[in-house]
Amino acid sequence: MEVSMPLPQIYVEKTLALIKPDVVDKEEEIQDIILGSGFTIIQRRKLHLSPEHCSNFYVEQYGKMFFPNLTAYMSSGPLVAMILARHKAISYWKELMGPSNSLVAKETHPDSLRAIYGTDELRNALHGSNDFAASEREIRFMFPAVIIEPIPIGQAAKDYINLYVAPTLLQGLTELCKEKPPDPYLWLADWLMKNNPNKPKLCHFPVTEEP
């Protein structure tokens, strides 16, 4: 009996990002920075969490002195939740946000998002998952219907590269040798962009506000 094997897949790390209530009006600016930093926004929703939902989301902070203020702040108005994807999404998003205390960020990382948009330690504009386990939990919390795929290891990634990346790259290098452009790096980059067989189609998702 012939067994049909599924095609290998490649997965990109994902993280949860929140634009907090007091900077929701800066969403478009912040998203432009996110996209310009190499992230893809996989999912996006605008919602208003109740204090109870905020308590459940920040359950690991329960019992700390700032917990009541945190839940009050996060439930004070609508926020924007996004699933961001790219290579090493969790660490890159944390780096782009900067230190959790916006006052510190303004001193040590003045170009970070929390330095630009945050106010203080509590009102720090943005949230990001701390690690992979937190990312899985937080994405499920904000996007219950999303299926989180495992990160590939070893052979699955190699199979994907051999089947889908290597042929296109080889064709590009062959064309490069024929063309002999003055700037081969720029030419190849441009060729790969134009001939990417997996080039995504731009989808415009409707913006919905939830109570």
UniProtKB/Swiss-Prot annotation:
Expressed in the trachea, ependymal cells and oviduct (at protein level). Expressed predominantly in germ cells of the testis. Not expressed in testicular somatic cells. Transmembrane segments: none annotated. It comes from the Eukaryota. Its EC number is 3.1.-.-. Signal peptide: none annotated. Keywords: Cell projection, Cilium, Cytoplasm, Cytoskeleton, Developmental protein, Differentiation, Flagellum, Hydrolase, Spermatogenesis. It is an enzyme of class 3 (hydrolase). It holds the Pfam family Dpy-30. Does not possess all residues considered to be crucial for the NDPK activity. This is Nucleoside diphosphate kinase homolog 5. It comes from Mus musculus. The gene is Nme5.
